[in-house]
Amino acid sequence: MLQYQPDHTVLRDKIILVTGAGDGIGKEAALTYARYGATLILLGRTLSKLEDVQNEIITSGGQQPMLYPLDLLTASENDYQEFADTIVKRFPHLDGVL
């Protein structure tokens, strides 16, 4: 059986938005993407959880991610527009969304 081992820089120069990044699958995805060199936007409901993930990423040598606390279930149209505007100002594009 073959086991694929991607190069540790396979996601370098890739910008990925991770929803639910404060815990669970979102957190694990964010940590994995960071390990492979991605620039991350961490979206989640709880700022303290996002900060914990950010600290893990930085401690392990990853790039500092952008944090954006927002509850998608209760967000208003204006909240979504503000989030989109923030991303457009800080990043030229997105390569992936989880």
Which functions belong to the PLM regions below?
Residues 73-90:
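Conserved Rossmann-fold cofactor-binding substructure of NAD(P)-dependent oxidoreductases
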Residues 1-17:
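Flexible N-terminal pre-Rossmann segment of NAD(P)-dependent oxidoreductases
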Residues 22-24:
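Conserved glycine-rich cofactor-binding loop
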Residues 16-20, 43:
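Conserved N-terminal Rossmann-fold NAD(P)-binding element of oxidoreductases
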Residues 33:
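Aromatic pocket-lining residues of Rossmann-like dinucleotide-binding sites
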Residues 38-52:
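Conserved glycine-rich Rossmann-like NAD(P)H-binding loop of the short-chain dehydrogenase/reductase
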Residues 60-76:
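Rossmann-fold cofactor-recognition segment
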Residues 61-64, 86-97:
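A glycine-rich helix->loop->beta "capping" turn
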